[in-house]
Amino acid sequence: MSKNTSPADGAGTDPQSVDAAVTSASTKPRISVIGTGYLGATHAAAMAEMGFDVIGVDTDPSKVEALSQGRVPFFEPGLPELILRHVESGRLLFTTDIAEAGALSDVHFICVGTPQRRGSHAANLSYVEEATRKVAESLSHDGLIVGKSTVPVGTAARLREIVAGVLPAGVSADVVWNPEFLREGHAVEDTLRPDRIVFGGTDVRSEAILREVYAEPISTGTPVISCDLPTAELVKVSANAFLATKISFINAISELCEAAGANVSTLADALGFDDRIGRKFLNAGLGFGGGCLPKDIRALMFRANELGAHRAVGLMQQVDEINMA
C-alpha cells in the first residue's frame, strides 16, 4: 500500500496504471465531507466548485441550516459566496444524516476537529474515530475514506482496523490520508489552487480516484507527493512545527538583540533575503496562537514521547516554552 515518490510526478504507483484506472471510471465520484467547520465547509465548497456533487455532514443542525443558506459561522473571504452559489445550483447540500452521505457518496473526506485533550497534550481523536466508523457502517457500496484532519502519526492505521471491523457484508473500503495545508484568510484559494497535494497509503485504485478528484489543480502543475500513511500524517504537523520553531527562534534572537543593542527587525530582513530562510514568520514579539499551532506541536510532543523520539520532544518543548514566556 505504501510508496515513495518524487514531488515532480507524485506517483509511487505506476503512472500508466493510474491513468488506465482513471480512464476506466465512467462517472465522476460523488463526495461527502464529514465535519463542516473551517476545514470541512471550505473543502465541500471547493469540491463543488471543481464540478462534483457534494454532501456536507455535521452533527449540529443549526450549522447545517446556516450553511444551507450560505451563512458561514466564521470569517473566510469568498467562502459564503461560493457555498451559496453551489447550494443554489444543487451541487452542494448539507445534512445531519451521515447514513445518507454514506449511502449516496463514493469518496468520504473526514474533516472533523482533533482538539487537545483536557488536561493533556494529546489530541482528542474521538471525533475522527466516530466519524470514520459511522461512514464505514453506512456504506451501501465500495468507497474510499480520505482523512484530512490533522492527526498523530499512527492514527490512520488504527482507523483501517476500525473500518475493517464494521463494514457491511460485501462492501469494501480503504482509508487513505490527504492532509490539508490551509492558511486563514486564504483557505478557498489554498484548496482550489494548492501548492502541493499529498496522498498517503494509496494503491492504484485509490490514487486514481484522488487524482480524478484533484484533476483540476494537478492539470495546472500542482505537485503530487504519494507516500506511506505515517509520512502523510506527519507532513502537516511537521510543517506547523517548523513554522512554530521559526517564530520562537526569532523571539529568542530578539532577546539577544535587545541585550546587545541590535535591531531585530533589520536582522530579520537580512535573514529573509536568504532564500533558504525567507522572511515569513520572522516578526519578533508576536508569539504563535490560534487553533492549530499550539495544539499541533503539543500533540506532536506527546506522540513523539510515546514513540521514544526524545530529541523531537525536547525541541518542541523549547519552542513551546519560548512562545509562552
Where do the PLM segments sit?
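Structural/interface elements that position substrates and couple domains in central-metabolism enzymes
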Residues: 2-325
